[in-house]
């Protein structure tokens, strides 16, 4: 596939060699400013643009010009569904992508099944999410998710089957409340690892291209275009050769470029909690945030949510085993939520890195705590020193380059395997055992029921690496994902999706109240922004139903848990 699309809607002889004048209102805030004297949008500075392709100086000469109804910036979890949904509604659409291929993360996506729930149950579940977010959630965006995510999950099931990469597992859970109401959620799991949503979105992009979407790879969006009224009328893309392409959008532009975790300048000011942590993703430099702020959009207030975890080094996360840092020293009360461990880890010698330590009795201990431990044989899947077939066909479900679990006969050997000082680890275990025998954790106050001696070989260690998976806040939007100015007024014909849009959660640590909500809300906002841009309405012409899902080849009894 070439960098530019095979199908263009506006072509003119000699256009590639002729300069095309841009609208004088392309970047109103920078009118009359020389390129060498750029005025930065409120809240931004020069360093914010150092890692991003976004340009502030007005671009007025183009190598080519194309016109579509809908232009999507970013071919990811939100962008590809947006573009495909737009063409399904009869619009012409293209998608600009900074990378040479679509890019996505995660594996599970979840939606709320309105027709299998009742109104009170849905409200109860949504209220539970808002309370879990300590009342910091954006209720409007939450409502959008609850209203539209169920249909989106069904749409993804049908389209992914057509694309040749359906979920390997689909399951529903029904919550029943004391008032007699109920709410059902459905989760699609794409994989198993090493396959993820990335394979899904790449397959979906091929389907979208077959159905009329033009993709422009290695062509980032670098500047939004507006008319004299302030409405967005297009975007400027930049090719690998450094040429500017003008993409006119007669109905709207959808920004779906992801978060800003790889823009260290923005991170240090807007999410300094994570500035010392490693990042899981690449290329997420806040391009959409910068582009929209350049035409007057706001950035949601500081206090941005972040998603930080490690589900790859080993299979256990919330078990309150002894935990040590890279110096081999205990540093916390281990009775903590996994998604919040970063709050302790940011103060450690190597932020994000730690090891869980336990012994041969761990299965009985976890069972006593009310959990379900991974048995020793299955734990071996995560041990890099044990050779076995970990291919996707094996069903191992791991990313082999990230597994980091170890089993040794002595603590000295375990320390070497984990890469931490043996004397420090031994001292930490000895001190821990003393506290267990005393019946009171005078160092960190962990409950006595979670204090268990570590004295029976073999000894186990899981070397964990907490990194930034996502920064879950972006440009200001309203409850319909329309981008807004700092004063709250809508910028016409401009939408944004996913984590780059608003702040759904609001909690410093992304809420795990509904597993799969992160990818689910990216897909949902993408699909429905594509529909809205194409039709002006937030409802598909032909909503996908379970009858469509069944017709696509799924066993509905399995999905509904009947068998």
Each predicted region: which residue ranges?
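Conserved N-terminal glycine-rich FAD pyrophosphate-binding loop of Rossmann-like flavoproteins
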Residues: 99-120
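Extreme N-terminal leader/targeting segments of oxidoreductases
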Residues: 2-4, 8-69
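Glycine-rich active-site loop/strand segments that organize a redox cofactor
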Residues: 113-145
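Conserved redox-cofactor binding core of oxidoreductases
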Residues: 147-243, 264-265, 436-456
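Glycine-rich loop(s) and the adjacent beta-strand/alpha-helix scaffold that form part
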Residues: 240-243, 248-311, 515, 519-528
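N-terminal Rossmann-like FAD-binding beta1-loop-alpha1 element of flavoenzymes
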Residues: 70-94
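An anion/pyrophosphate-binding glycine-rich loop and adjacent beta-alpha core
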Residues: 289, 298-417
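A glycine-rich dinucleotide-binding beta-alpha-beta segment and adjacent secondary-structure elements
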Residues: 223, 424-508, 512
């Amino acid at each position: 596939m070439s960098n530019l699309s095979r199908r263009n809607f506006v072509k003119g002889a000699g256009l590639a060699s002729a300069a095309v004048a841009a609208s004088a209102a392309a970047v109103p805030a920078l009118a009359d400013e020389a390129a060498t004297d750029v005025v930065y949008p409120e809240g931004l500075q020069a360093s914010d643009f150092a890692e991003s392709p976004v340009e502030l100086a007005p671009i007025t000469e183009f190598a080519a010009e194309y016109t579509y109804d809908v232009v999507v910036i970013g071919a990811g979890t939100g962008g590809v569904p947006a573009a495909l949904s737009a063409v399904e509604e009869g619009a012409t659409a293209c998608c600009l992508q900074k990378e040479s291929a679509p890019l996505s993360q995660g594996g599970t996506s979840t939606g709320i099944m309105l027709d299998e729930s009742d109104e009170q149950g849905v409200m109860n579940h949504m209220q539970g999410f808002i309370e879990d977010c300590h009342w910091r959630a954006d209720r409007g965006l939450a409502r959008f998710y609850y209203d539209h995510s169920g249909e989106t999950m069904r749409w993804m099931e049908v389209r992914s089957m057509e694309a040749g990469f359906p979920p390997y597992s689909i399951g529903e859970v029904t919550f029943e409340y004391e008032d007699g109401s109920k709410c059902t959620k459905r989760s699609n799991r794409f994989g198993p690892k090493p396959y993820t949503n990335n394979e899904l979105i790449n397959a979906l992009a091929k389907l979208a291209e077959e159905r009329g979407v033009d993709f422009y790879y290695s062509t980032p969006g670098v500047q939004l275009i507006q008319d004299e009224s302030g409405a967005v009328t297009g975007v400027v893309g930049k090719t690998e050769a450094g040429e500017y392409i003008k993409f006119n959008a007669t109905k709207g532009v959808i920004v779906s470029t992801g978060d800003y975790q790889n823009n260290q300048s923005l991170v240090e000011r807007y999410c300094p909690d994570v500035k010392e942590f490693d990042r899981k993703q690449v290329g997420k430099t806040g391009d959409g945030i910068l582009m929209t702020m350049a035409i007057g959009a706001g950035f949601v207030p500081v206090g941005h949510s972040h998603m930080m975890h490690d589900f790859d080094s080993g299979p256990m996360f919330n078990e309150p085993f002894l935990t040590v840092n890279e110096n081999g020293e205990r540093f916390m009360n281990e009775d903590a939520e996994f998604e919040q461990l970063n709050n302790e880890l940011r103060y450690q010698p190597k932020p994000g890195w730690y090891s869980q330590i336990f012994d041969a009795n761990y299965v009985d201990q976890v069972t006593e705590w009310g959990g379900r431990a991974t048995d020793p044989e299955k734990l071996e899947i995560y041990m890099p020193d044990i050779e076995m077939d970990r291919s996707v066909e094996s069903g191992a479900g791991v990313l082999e380059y990230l597994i980091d679990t170890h089993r040794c006969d002595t603590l000295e050997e375990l320390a070497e395997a984990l890469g931490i000082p043996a004397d420090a680890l031994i001292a930490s275990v000895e001190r821990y055992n003393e506290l267990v025998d005393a019946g009171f954790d005078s160092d960190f106050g962990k409950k006595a029921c979670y204090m268990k001696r570590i004295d029976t070989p073999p000894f186990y260690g899981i070397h964990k690496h907490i990194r930034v998976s996502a920064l879950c806040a972006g440009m200001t939007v309203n409850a319909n994902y329309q981008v807004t100015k700092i004063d709250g007024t809508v910028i016409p014909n401009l939408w944004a999706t996913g984590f780059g849009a608003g702040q759904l959660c609001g909690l410093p640590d992304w809420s795990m109240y509904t597993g799969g909500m992160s990818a689910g809300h990216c897909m949902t906002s993408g699909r429905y922004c594509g529909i809205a841009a194409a039709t002006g309405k937030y409802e598909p012409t032909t909503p996908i139903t379970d009858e469509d899902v069944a017709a696509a080849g799924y066993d509905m009894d399995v999905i509904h848990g009947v068998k």
